């Protein structure tokens, strides 16, 4: 992969690499991959998300669904609106809290759609760890608020409030939570971590994985020698924390991933770990630390169990295509575009193709939701009565 980098970028990566190397040395020559990923992405002032860089969109490293089309956010509104209306009906603030809002495109499209529908949202809060992205979010939302004369209060928070009543939203967040890697050797699973050889990061086998940490399918499946995959204790803990702190309302996330049986399929020999840079993906996570985004697919079964551990009302999983179609994305497209005018409708059609096609984002990306005390807001309704979540539950 041919990458042209500035001297500043090279120096940035070198400094972060040195810091990670020092960490490895201080830990006896080996660290879990989750620690490497944490430093590569989030080391203050140096990690991929902590340092300023153009990460999203055409000129960035990857493009998310909100960047493709405002239809994505408009369709999500169909799911959120009944919950927001229920909050207002109970005399509570109608509020959305978004984690990792990227460039702010999703927030903008949601607020624009709510404005078109005549609904005044009380609060739209964002939790964002990237200073660069937070600035871009503020600029975009301030401009939108001025153009539409919005009355919604937008704020940037450091943590999710306890006993939150409202909607929690996260698009492509869980995939960037550090994961642990493991390898199958001689009939046993071992932690697969990071070490150093000639000042280069290398994979190195660690201690055996405790059986209690392994999904049942990894204990009973037939795996080939050298099979590698991931575990997601931090991501599962994050979902569990969301469930604990959501008092009343809805949690909705969209991300790429698989159910457990597909995630740990014996033929998926090298797991799902990828590094992204300027719309290219490679499997070497040690290449230019701090300049590549590191991700792994979400394993949805354990996410669901984490949510259910806090006694949520309902948990739901479907693919992105089914979610968006049930949320009315096709009808919304016809509202804003004229199919008889190919010049204006072709971009809309192209974005729909990418969002819905099984070969693009339609199947790999999933919509995962859970609710808490939804009946308090929407009497005699369940999670599966909300637009977008009325199809087959894949959990």
Language-model features, listed with the residues they occupy:
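Rossmann-like AdoMet
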Residues: 1-99, 103-165, 336, 350-395
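A residue-level signal for conserved active-site and pocket-lining positions in enzyme catalytic cores
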Residues: 40, 168, 303
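Short helix/loop capping segments that flank catalytic or ligand/cofactor-binding pockets
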Residues: 49, 176-179, 262, 377-379
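Conserved protein kinase catalytic core
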Residues: 134, 165, 177-178, 261
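A mobile, often basic/glycine-rich helix-loop segment
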Residues: 167-216, 266-276
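Long, Lys/Arg- and hydrophobic-enriched amphipathic alpha-helices
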Residues: 214-395
């Amino acid at each position: 992969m041919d990458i042209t980098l500035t001297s500043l970028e090279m120096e940035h990566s070198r400094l972060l690499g040195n810091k990670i190397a020092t960490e490895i040395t201080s830990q006896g020559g080996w660290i879990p991959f989750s620690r490497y990923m944490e430093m590569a992405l989030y080391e203050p002032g140096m990690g991929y998300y902590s340092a300023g860089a153009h990460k999203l969109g055409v000129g960035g490293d990857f493009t998310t669904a909100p960047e493709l089309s405002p239809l994505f956010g408009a369709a999500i509104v169909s799911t959120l609106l009944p919950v927001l209306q229920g909050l207002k009906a109970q005399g509570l603030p109608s509020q959305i809290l978004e984690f990792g809002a990227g460039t702010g495109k999703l927030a903008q499209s949601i607020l624009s759609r709510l404005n078109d529908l005549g609904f005044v949202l009380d609060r739209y809060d964002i939790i964002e760890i990237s200073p660069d992205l937070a600035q871009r979010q503020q600029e975009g939302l301030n401009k939108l608020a001025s153009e539409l004369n919005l009355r919604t209060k937008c704020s940037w928070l450091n943590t999710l409030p306890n006993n939150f009543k409202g909607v929690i939203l996260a698009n492509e967040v869980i995939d960037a939570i550090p994961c642990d890697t493991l390898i199958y050797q001689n009939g046993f699973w071992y932690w697969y971590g990071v070490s150093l050889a000639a000042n280069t990061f290398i994979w190195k086998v660690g201690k055996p994985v405790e059986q209690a940490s392994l999904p049942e399918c990894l204990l009973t499946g037939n795996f080939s020698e050298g099979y590698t995959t991931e575990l997601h204790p931090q991501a599962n803990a994050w979902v569990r924390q969301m469930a604990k702190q959501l008092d009343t309302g809805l949690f909705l996330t969209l991300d790429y991933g698989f159910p457990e049986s597909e995630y740990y399929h014996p033929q998926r020999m090298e797991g799902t770990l990828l590094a992204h840079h300027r719309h290219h993906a490679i499997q070497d996570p040690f290449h230019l630390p701090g300049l590549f985004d590191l991700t792994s697919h979400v394993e949805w079964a354990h996410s669901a169990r984490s949510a259910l551990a806090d006694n949520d009302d309902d948990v739901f999983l479907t693919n992105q295509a089914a979610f968006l179609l049930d949320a009315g994305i096709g009808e919304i497209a016809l509202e804003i575009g004229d199919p008889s005018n190919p010049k204006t409708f072709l971009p809309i059609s192209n974005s729909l193709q990418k969002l819905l096609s099984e070969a693009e984002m339609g199947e790999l990306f999933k919509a995962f939701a859970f609710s808490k005390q939804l009946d308090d807001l929407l009497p005699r309704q369940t999670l599966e009565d909300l637009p977008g979540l009325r199809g087959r539950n894949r959990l």
